[in-house]
From Swiss-Prot:
Statement: the UniProt record of this protein carries the keyword DNA damage: no
Localization: Cell membrane; Secreted; Host cytoplasm; Host nucleus
Lipidation (GPI-anchor amidated threonine): T211
Gene: CFEM1
Domain commentary: The CFEM domain is involved in heme-binding and contains 8 cysteines and is found in proteins from several pathogenic fungi, including both human and plant pathogens. The CFEM domain adopts a novel helical-basket fold that consists of six alpha-helices, and is uniquely stabilized by four disulfide bonds formed by its 8 signature cysteines.
Disulfide cross-links: C30-C72, C34-C67, C44-C51, C53-C88
Keywords from the named record: Cell membrane, Disulfide bond, Glycoprotein, GPI-anchor, Heme, Host cell membrane, Host cytoplasm, Host membrane, Host nucleus, Iron, Lipoprotein, Membrane, Metal-binding, Secreted, Signal, Virulence
GO biological process, one term: biological process involved in interaction with host
Record's function text: Appears to function during host infection, and may play a role in suppressing the host immune response.
Protein's name according to its UniProt entry: Effector CFEM1
Induction: Induced during infection of poplar leaves, with highest expression observed four days post inoculation.
SMART domains xrefs: CFEM
Domain CFEM: residue ranges: 18-114
């Protein structure tokens, strides 16, 4: 069993007010020793109700509760809880009528107002931060939009992709070098054949010279054609 009242620890040997004395008389005898020990341990005296119901209240309650539970019946423990609560209520009512108590109440109200204001400011700051984060996320999405599969690339992008594919299918530098070497070799062979034919034509009859001239013309035609073919492959 655990007490929920603010005070379980008031032991009254004497009282300065009749109402407080009447309440003190209602505390079960089984709880008085427990309360007296807890009050002394907290640094208060038996008749110092301001101390017992003030800053030492939690200490007295924590110390007296286990003792009261073990020493009293459930009914007696409940009566102790109810009576000590009423005594502290009378102490609080008497303190509230003094100027110092009014000052304390005002300070407490001011502190509560400050706490409320601080909480409101923190809430506004958090809301502002959330708005800023949302705006930043929107700006990032606009600057770097996520591709949408339902919207195909624009015609310009498709054209660029086709160019890249077409360029990738062209001859590589190694292939172009091989083709160039083959064309040069073929041209050299034709040129050598033409030269041999011309030399033979100078010592042979006119029909042979005519044949050599024809071979030379074929060689002259083949070489430019080979160069043109090489240019086509190089594109």
């Amino acid at each position: 069993m655990k007490f929920s009242a603010p005070v379980l620890a008031i032991f009254l040997a004497s009282a300065s007010a009749q109402s407080t004395a009447e309440l003190a008389a209602q505390i079960p005898s089984c709880a008085q020793t427990c309360l007296a020990t807890a009050i002394t341990g907290a640094g208060c005296t038996a008749g110092d109700y301001a101390c017992q119901c003030g800053t030492s209240q939690n200490t007295i309650t924590a110390s007296a509760t286990p003792c009261v539970i073990s020493a009293c019946t459930s009914e007696e423990a409940l009566n102790t809880q109810r009576t000590t609560s009423q005594i502290c209520a009378l102490v609080a009512a008497g303190s509230a009528s003094s100027p110092s108590a009014s000052s304390s109440a005002s300070a407490s109200a001011s502190s509560s107002a400050s706490s409320t204001s601080g909480a409101a400011s923190a809430s506004a700051s958090a809301s502002s931060s959330a708005s800023s984060a949302s705006a930043a996320a929107s700006a990032l999405t606009l600057a770097h939009p996520i591709p949408n599969p339902s919207h195909p690339p624009s015609p310009t992008i498709q054209t660029n992709l086709r160019k890249k594919v077409r360029n990738s299918n062209r001859l590589t530098p190694a292939s172009l070098s091989s083709v160039s070497s083959a064309l040069v070799s073929s041209a050299s062979s034709v040129r050598a054949s033409a030269s041999s034919a011309v030399s033979a034509a100078t010592t042979a009859a006119n029909p042979a010279a005519t044949t050599a001239a024809g071979v030379k013309e074929e060689a002259s035609f083949f070489i430019p054609a080979a160069v043109a073919l090489f240019a086509v492959f190089a594109v």
